[in-house]
Amino acid sequence: MREFINKVFAELDIGLRPLDPETLESANTMSGLNIVLRADLGAMTLEGRCDLLALDDICDPRFPEFQKHILRLNDLDFLPGDFRIGVSLVDLTVQMKGVLSVNPGDSGTGGRIMHMLKSMVFYGTVSRDRLLSSYDELYQESSGTVPEN
């Protein structure tokens, strides 16, 4: 399956790095977003993960309120059902994830991967902007000032 996915990546001709033979990951930067694609050979899936925002301090008293803003982005009236946004406590980042079934030999795989990537870039960019705006609003409400970015 790794060879199939790497072939599809090459056919898309958008500069995707091939899957690493050991980690089965492909780290890419698209429109300023770090997007990692990871194959799961057992489940026959390709997971897309996009870091939206680094978190400085989850012990900050504002974090629980900010986390509510993060989770609200999962509403179906905004984010498609095959994507989810959450907090990675290991990486201290807000991440968006999506999963795509891969069937070697399926001629539509390239189109589905391209759709997933375009969706990640669009929704990732919009989500990041919304999160930054929410963070700035929370910071203003609690301290009366906005931090310098």
Residue spans for each PLM region:
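Short, internal acidic amphipathic alpha-helical interface segments
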Residues: 51-99
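A short acidic-to-branched-hydrophobic micro-motif
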Residues: 35-57
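Short, highly charged C-terminal tails/helix-capping segments
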Residues: 130-149
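Hydrophobic residues embedded in beta-strands of well-ordered beta-sheets
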Residues: 24, 44-46, 92-94
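Charge-rich, low-complexity N-terminal segments
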Residues: 1-41
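Extended hydrophobic/Leu-rich segments
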Residues: 19, 23-27, 41, 55, ...
